[in-house]
């Protein structure tokens, strides 16, 4: 959209790995992100973005990116079927073992 105007363009970088930015345009595009240094040397991000779809609805994604990877959340993202009961039980057992400090080579 050539006629879109920038409504917000804020950037704050503290120079130590901590930062925040926010950007918004008059045509409904918006993004914001906050970053912090991670405990394992990585950068941790938390943010969101949204934009209008052709049908007039708004697409929105929120996310976290940290030592566990990129973790998006949105009604637009596909969701797999639930794990069968026997798999769910195995996952619970594995989590119990992990909490007890049990490891396997």
From Swiss-Prot:
Transmembrane segments: none annotated. InterPro entries: CHIT_BIND_RR_consensus, Cuticle_Struct_Prot, Insect_cuticle. GO terms for cellular component: chitin-based extracellular matrix. This is Cuticle protein AMP3. GO terms for molecular function: structural constituent of chitin-based larval cuticle. Residues 16-81 form the Chitin-binding type R&R domain. Keywords: Cuticle. Residues 1-21 are annotated as: Disordered. Arthrodial membrane.
